């Protein structure tokens, strides 16, 4: 990875799922955090987990120098989603978290960035806002990064990040798309919508999530994760 970054001639970027307290923070680097309703995060995670090839999970668990608990293979079938939500809400892979199984707690992850959202080199972006106003959010991100907008090609860029465009170009757009990680690479881009959990999990489960989000994140962050809205 480091060799790839060193070889880039354009601006370097790293995508990570690490919380802010899990990375080295530098004033000269700009950070973008993308938030989402935790119930939507679960739906996306559930699809990715069941779409990963078992041999890939095994290889990740046995990578040289790997630290931390192993990633579990999916428990049951993709249709067992309601039981999976209960596990996600009440189990953890790490001693310092109480939820997020089998990967990490989205709520803890979001809270670490939220605490420092006032810093000039942290931009808070919400998935819902990206869907509703793709053009506006792309311009906001471009301004934050100091990237000039070329109006001659701008609409092509906006069209290029649409769900249908990325799904049709999944081998190039999906993480690991060219590395045979997924059972179905195009299924990495599964739906690209929010609120799919409605009618899938029960009202009791949804309420349990809302209660946990309020406890772990506080009212402001819990509300932002659910509804979005620009922070500036």
Specify the residue positions occupied by each region the protein language model found.
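Hydrophobic/aromatic-lined pockets within catalytic cores
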Residues: 46-50, 118, 142-149, 162
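PAPS-dependent sulfotransferase catalytic domain
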Residues: 1-125, 135, 179-232
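Short, glycine/acidic-rich hinge or "gate" loops at secondary-structure transitions
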Residues: 153-157, 229
């Amino acid at each position: 990875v480091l060799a790839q970054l060193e070889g880039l001639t354009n601006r370097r970027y790293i995508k990570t799922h690490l919380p802010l307290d899990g990375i080295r923070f530098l004033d000269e680097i700009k950070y973008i955090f993308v938030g989402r309703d935790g119930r939507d995060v679960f739906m996306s995670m559930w699809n990715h987990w069941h779409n990963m090839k078992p041999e890939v999970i095994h290889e990740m668990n046995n990578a040289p120098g790997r630290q931390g608990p192993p990633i579990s293979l999916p428990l049951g079938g993709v249709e067992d989603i309601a039981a999976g939500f209960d596990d996600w809400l009440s189990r953890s892979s790490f001693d310092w978290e109480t939820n997020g199984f089998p990967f990490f707690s989205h709520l803890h992850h979001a809270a670490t960035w939220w605490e420092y959202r006032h810093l000039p080199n942290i931009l808070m972006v919400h998935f819902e806002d990206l869907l509703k106003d793709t053009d506006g959010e792309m311009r906001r991100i471009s301004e934050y990064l100091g990237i000039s907008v070329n109006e001659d090609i701008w609409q092509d860029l906006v069209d290029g990040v649409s769900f249908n465009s990325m799904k049709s170009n999944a081998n190039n757009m999906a993480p690991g798309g060219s590395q045979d990680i997924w059972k179905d690479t195009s299924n990495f881009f599964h739906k690209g919508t929010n609120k799919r959990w409605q009618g899938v999990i029960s009202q009791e489960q949804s309420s349990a999530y809302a209660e946990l989000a309020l406890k772990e994140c506080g009212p402001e962050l819990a509300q932002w994760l659910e509804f979005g809205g620009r922070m500036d």
